Structures are given as structure tokens and as C-alpha cells.
Amino acid sequence: MTRPSAYLSRALAAYRRTGADLPYGDPRRAHGVAMEGYFWRVTDRDRGRSLIALIGVNRGPRGPWATLGLAAWPDPALTVTATTQGYADPARLGARAGSAFVADERRVEVDLGPGARLSIEVDEPLPWPQARFGGSSGFHSVPALNQYWHPWLLGGRVRGTAEVGDQTWELDGAQVYGEKNWGKGGFPDSWWWGQAQGFEDRGASVAFAGGQVSAG
């Protein structure tokens, strides 16, 4: 005989596989939807540098695959690739694609080839405060939306380096921001987003997003 607690656990797991989260849940964990995206931005205010790293873990009819990206400014550098490997962690924030991209809440390791590498650890993280909902507010609890969004890391300092073209950037002390987006079918037809950090007040960070979101 199946115990009531087992029925409840199955029901909650099925609910979360739609992409939704109950109030006070943890939206950082993978949901098992078609796309789980992870994004980091590093801002070195003192040296006038910025870079981003991203991984999108996708679930297709032939199995998981991932899109990977690394970009830098002011030296123009952009590397984007796709791989047949991809994993999003259902127990905590974490994603990987073989040895090309390995990341969790405290580190990001990217190796997309010569001139496109990143290795950082996060110190003094400033996480999203414990609250009823994440960045998508009450829409987190609505099942089967095509897009959810959550800025889980509002600030912190990094230790590490980046290989940008023929340069090696020292990133110790730079600021970091991290977010996650997920949904049943990738990005909506319309989506806009912005994020800023590197202010004189190192605790200040701004992020916003919006788009055409549908359910079903």
C-alpha cells in the first residue's frame, strides 16, 4: 500500500516538472523542462572589463544537448558552440557539459578552446534573499509557462582568470552576478533584459527582464 506521503511527493515532483515552484521553494534547482539556462556576468570596474558565460541545457527527442557561450568587453570576443553533452542538477544549482563547462553556485569553469577560457570561484556571495517567490514573483507558481526567470546571485567577488584571445585577464576582486531561466520551449518570441553592476557601492546591483509569456 502506497503511503499518503509518497502520493504527495509524486504530485509535487510532477508539479515541479512543469517548471513551477511552490512559495518558498528553491527555483535554482533544475526542473526537468525543455530548457534550463544559466548565466554569469563578471564586471571588473577597476580595469574597465566585463565578460559573460552561459550554458543552456536542452532536452530533445534524441537526448540532452547544450549551448555554450563566452563573451568579453572591451576587447571584442565571442565564442558560441553547441555540444551533445548537457546536464542540469536537480538537487542544487549546477550545470555542466563535459569538460567544456562546469559550474555551480561557487565556481565557473569554461574551456571553449584557446582564447575562450574562464576559471573563477565566488567569494562573499550576495544571494537572492529568502522570500516567498523568486524573480518571476507569483508567476513562479503557475505551471507550464514557456519562460521563468530568477536572478539568484545579486553580487559577490571572484577569484580567478580568463583567457580572452591572446590575453590573460586577472579577475581577482571583480564583481559577479548570476541568474537562471528555464521553460518548456526556450525563449519566448519577445524577450527583453537588462543588468548592471560595478557601481561605487559594491552592494548595488540592478536586474530586470520581461517578455511574452504563455502557459499550457
Where do the language-model regions lie?
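Structured soluble/peripheral alpha/beta segments that form catalytic or ligand/cofactor-binding pockets
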Residues: 1-216
